[in-house]
Amino acid sequence: MIITIGGLAGTGTTTVARILSERMGIPCVSAGDVFRQMAAERELDILEFSRIAEENPEIDIEIDRRQARLADEHEDLILEGRLSAHFARADLKVLLIAPFDVRAQRISVRESKDIETVREEIRIRERSEAQRYREIHGIDVDDLEVYDIVINTNRFDAEAS
């Protein structure tokens, strides 16, 4: 079974993907894993590669291609990433959501950052990503039609999600 798990930062995608992987006994690959692999292939650290990726849409496109290829090569796999459901063949496509303030609080705790700083960073990142995804892929991130299930993780802790 191929499962994609997507969602905005702070919704719990990485945590849920990891827990599902452990409980189902199937591998999990995140878009972040693919990004780190691509940086290593170029012998760049993550920060350097991130700067390059901001200016080069081909990097986003390659991440999507690699995740789609992984889905084609495996019978059982969990793919975690914001756009995984749009590009990978999957039996189940899940979107996790949570209110803005809940996500900001989770990220603030996780990264030990001031909540107001996190809120501003989220706003900037989400505007930037929405624009990039629309320009590069023609994807409207607010269109949920591609997903089979949408789960609000607001009331769940990591294990319950």
From Swiss-Prot:
Annotated residues for binding of ATP: 7-15
Domain of life, per lineage: Archaea
Reaction catalyzed: CMP + ATP = CDP + ADP; dCMP + ATP = dCDP + ADP
One cellular component term from this protein's GO annotations in UniProt: cytoplasm
GO biological process: pyrimidine nucleotide metabolic process
A molecular function (GO) term: dCMP kinase activity
Subcellular compartments: Cytoplasm
Disulfide bonds listed in the record: none
Pfam families: Cytidylate_kin2
Enzyme type, top EC level: transferase
Record key words, sorted: ATP-binding, Cytoplasm, Kinase, Nucleotide-binding, Transferase
EC nos: 2.7.4.25
Keyword Nucleotide-binding carried by entry: yes
Entry similarity comment: Belongs to the cytidylate kinase family. Type 2 subfamily.
Name the UniProt record assigns to this protein: Cytidylate kinase
Species per Swiss-Prot/TrEMBL record: Methanothermobacter thermautotrophicus (strain ATCC 29096 / DSM 1053 / JCM 10044 / NBRC 100330 / Delta H) (Methanobacterium thermoautotrophicum)
